[in-house]
Amino acid sequence: MTEKNEEVVEDKNISDQTDENLTEEIESEADDLQVEPDPKQAEIDKLTEQVNNLEEKLLRSQAEIQNIQQRNARELQNVRKYDGQKLASAVLPAVDNLERALQVEANDEVSKQIKTGVEMTLKTLNQALTDNGITSTGEIGESFDPTKHQAIQSVESDEVESDQIAQVLQKGYILQDRVIRPAMVAVAK
């Protein structure tokens, strides 16, 4: 080999040895820099994780409490809204009986006075029902609605159009938006 080539090879060997020495030195210094984990830092990390978990549980609990409060408010509102349903259901048969009593012909003076008393009583009861959000449903000529009316029969009728109420057998009643009792009706064909 030529002298120049030998120098290049020798320089390369020196360079490789220098690189290896530097690499070993850097690795040695890196090992020295790697310190055992601080036990206090590990405890801090553990406590931080516990705090985060507890905060998450707190948020969930607060959301659950809020949902319960909203549900209770809705239920209370429904109780107030439909408060008179049980009483209305108990009173409606009396209203029906008073209406039937008014259909009887009054011939003498005493019967007429009794009929007037029954009319006043019925008017007072109907006003009390209306004041408490209870309305009647099922009038002749009204369109048949299966959510509010119960069709007992279908009849031929010249007075009303098809699918309208031709005859009311028993009035229905609605409290707010809830049907207490559907009207029993005959529907025109």
UniProtKB/Swiss-Prot annotation:
Annotated keywords: Chaperone, Cytoplasm, Stress response
One annotated GO biological process: protein folding
Main location per the UniProt record: cytoplasm
Ranges of Acidic residues composition bias in the record: 17-35
NCBIfam families documented for this protein: PRK14140.1 (NF010738), PRK14150.1 (NF010748), PRK14162.1 (NF010759)
Spans annotated as Disordered: 1-38
Entry's Gene Ontology molecular function annotations: adenyl-nucleotide exchange factor activity; protein homodimerization activity; protein-folding chaperone binding; unfolded protein binding
Localization in the cell: Cytoplasm
Family to which this protein belongs: Belongs to the GrpE family.
Protein name, UniProt field: Protein GrpE
Record's function text: Participates actively in the response to hyperosmotic and heat shock by preventing the aggregation of stress-denatured proteins, in association with DnaK and GrpE. It is the nucleotide exchange factor for DnaK and may function as a thermosensor. Unfolded proteins bind initially to DnaJ; upon interaction with the DnaJ-bound protein, DnaK hydrolyzes its bound ATP, resulting in the formation of a stable complex. GrpE releases ADP from DnaK; ATP binding to DnaK triggers the release of the substrate protein, thus completing the reaction cycle.
Quaternary organization: Homodimer.
PANTHER family: GRPE PROTEIN (PTHR21237), GRPE PROTEIN HOMOLOG, MITOCHONDRIAL (PTHR21237:SF23)
Naturally occurring in which organism (per UniProt): Leuconostoc mesenteroides subsp. mesenteroides (strain ATCC 8293 / DSM 20343 / BCRC 11652 / CCM 1803 / JCM 6124 / NCDO 523 / NBRC 100496 / NCIMB 8023 / NCTC 12954 / NRRL B-1118 / 37Y)
Gene3D superfamilies from the UniProt entry: 3.90.20.20, Head domain of nucleotide exchange factor GrpE (2.30.22.10)
GO CC aspect terms: cytoplasm
Compositional bias annotation for Basic and acidic residues: 1-14
Pfam families: GrpE
Lineage, uppermost ranks: Bacteria, Bacillati, Bacillota, Bacilli, Lactobacillales
SUPFAM superfamilies, A to Z: Coiled-coil domain of nucleotide exchange factor GrpE, Head domain of nucleotide exchange factor GrpE
